[in-house]
């Protein structure tokens, strides 16, 4: 059973349990279909294994940001918002402007957020604040990037391996949870509705040492 199917089945089981309590049904039809405890553990271990491959290493993040800084500086703001802010790369990060970003917090406007609700990302890590200050000293600063898709295709090659699906969001989630050990905070910043699921998915995805190295990446390291 795929993990996504299991999670859907878990939601259905909760719904039918409520129906049982209210007398809307006699039995919960999902109970018999639920995987065993051993099978659930196997599913989660496999998923965490995939998360480790989907997260970029600190070295790969440095390679990416070094490419942006030296070859295409207009990409640096976009890359930092995805890497250190956890913004969605297709809709959120490309549309951020200076007014949305301060050294205290990032505001994702409702028209760009996936759930159509304004999201505040805070607190920001010390290294991210240094990146923000570094970027805002430049002309143009945070704004939409012309030819973003074409430029980003080239930038992704800098890590030296195939680009994992949605790896920047997975990287942020993995390193943020490892650093702060607060699934609720990580889920809130990502715009995820379920902190319990996030905790299961990202617990042990990266080590504390890796998280420390990730959150220590500074602009001076990528020139």
Which sequence ranges carry the predicted segments?
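Short, polar N-cap/turn motifs at the start of nucleic acid-interacting alpha helices
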Residues: 99-105, 162, 181-201
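C-terminal secondary-structure termini that scaffold catalytic or DNA-interacting sites
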Residues: 138, 212-223
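Basic, Lys/Arg- and aromatic-enriched nucleic-acid-binding interface segment
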Residues: 2-10, 21-90, 169
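Catalytic-site neighborhood detector that most strongly recognizes the C-terminal catalytic loop/helix
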Residues: 110-116, 129, 190-215
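Active-site/catalytic core of tyrosine-dependent DNA strand-transfer enzymes
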Residues: 61, 123-161, 172
């Amino acid at each position: 059973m795929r993990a996504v199917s299991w999670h859907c089945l878990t939601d259905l089981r909760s719904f039918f349990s409520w129906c049982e309590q209210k007398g809307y049904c006699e039995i919960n039809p999902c109970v018999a279909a639920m995987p065993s405890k051993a099978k659930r553990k196997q599913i989660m271990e496999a998923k965490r294994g995939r998360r480790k491959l989907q997260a970029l290493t600190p070295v790969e993040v440095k390679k990416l940001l070094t490419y942006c800084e030296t070859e295409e500086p207009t990409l640096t703001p976009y890359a930092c918002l995805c890497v250190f802010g956890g913004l969605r790369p297709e809709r959120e990060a490309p549309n951020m402007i200076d007014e949305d970003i301060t050294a205290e917090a990032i505001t994702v406007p409702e028209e760009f957020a996936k759930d159509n609700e304004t999201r505040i990302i805070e607190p920001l890590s010390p290294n991210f604040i240094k990146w923000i200050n570094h970027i805002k000293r430049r002309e143009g600063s945070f704004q939409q990037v012309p030819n973003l898709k074409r430029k980003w295709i080239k930038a992704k090659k800098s890590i030296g391996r195939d680009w994992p699906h949605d790896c920047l969001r997975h990287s942020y989630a993995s390193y943020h949870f490892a650093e702060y050990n607060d699934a609720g905070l990580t889920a809130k910043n990502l715009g995820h509705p379920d902190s319990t699921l996030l905790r299961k998915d990202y617990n042990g995805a990266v080590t504390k040492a890796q998280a420390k190295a990730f959150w220590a990446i500074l602009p001076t390291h990528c020139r």
